[in-house]
Amino acid sequence: MVTFLIYKIIMVVAVFAIALLTGMYSTYAERKIAAFLQDRVGPNRAGPFGILQPVADGVKMFMKEEFIPGFSNKALFILGPALALMIPFMTSVVIPWGGNLHINGHDYALQVTDINIGILYLFGVVSVGVYGIMIGGWASNNKYSLLGAVRASSQMISYELAMGFSIIALVMHTNTLSMGEMAAQQQGWHWNIFYQPLGFLIFIICAFAETNRAPFDLPECESELVGGYHTEYSSMKLGFYLFAEYINMFISSAVIATLYFGGYNMPLIGRFVHDPNWLTILGTCFLFAKIIFFIFVFMWVRWTLPRFRYDQLMNLGWKILMPLALANIAITGILMYLTGRIH
C-alpha cells in the first residue's frame, strides 16, 4: 500500500513536471516556428540557439510589477489565473502515458488514475476552465476584459457541445468511457482515426477553439479588445494565463493522440523488442512524438490561417460542426447495426 502510494505521488509529480517543461518550451518552439514561416531567425540571444529563452521570459514575468486595479474584486482577480492554470493539470491525471512497468513482481501503470468514467471526468473538468477566464475578465472591472471573457465563455461553451457529440460516436465504437481501455484497444493499426475520421476532424477543430488558438483567438483579439480578458493583468498572473494556453495545447495534443491515434501503441514494434519494460518505455516515447507533432500542427495553423469574424465563429460551431457531429453519431449507429454490433 505504501509502495503504491509513493508510486502515485511520483507519477503526479512527473506528469506535473513534464507538463510544465513542455509548456515552457512550447513558447520557444512557437517563436521559432513563427520565425521560420516568416523567414526570420527567432530567439537566439538567451543561451545557444536561444534555448534559454523560456527561462528568460519567466524571469522577466516574475520581475515585473504586480498591479491590481483599484476597483477590481481582488479575491476573484487572483483566483482567475490560478483556476485557468490548475484545470489542465487536473485533466492530465486520466491520460494513459504508457503501458505497464513490471518492477519487482508488481505492475505499475503509467497513468495517475484509470477511472471508468475518464471521458466524463475529462469533459467535466474542461468545462470548468471557462470559469477561470470569466472570473478574471469580470473581476478586472474593465469593459475590454469583460467583453473578452464573454467571448471566450460563449466560444468555449458552444464548441464543447460539438466536441462532446464527436466523442459520443467514439464511445459508441469503443464501448468504454475509460481512456486507459480506449488506448489499449488500439493495438497494432486499430487506431480510432480509421473508424472515426469525421469525429476526429470535428474534435481537432473544437480543440483549436477550446484552447483559444488562432484562428479562434477572438477572446484575445488585440485589434478589438486591447488584450482581451487579461488586459488588466501583469507579472506572474499574466504569465499564468499565457502559460495555461500552452499547457492546454499540450494536454489537448495528448488527448487527441490517445483517443484517435493509438496513444502509446506502436505498430510492429513487438516484432523487434520483446522485453515488456522496453516496450512500455518505447511506447511512451512514441506517444510523446505524436504529442509534439500535434503541438506543431497547433502552431502551424496559428501562423497560417487568419482570424475568424465572430459571426463566422458561431456559425461554424452551431450550423456546421454541430449537425456534422449529430450526423456522425447517426452514421456510427447505422454502421454498428449493419455489422451486427448492436441489435
Label every PLM stretch briefly:
Residues 1-343:
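Selective transmembrane helix interface/packing segments
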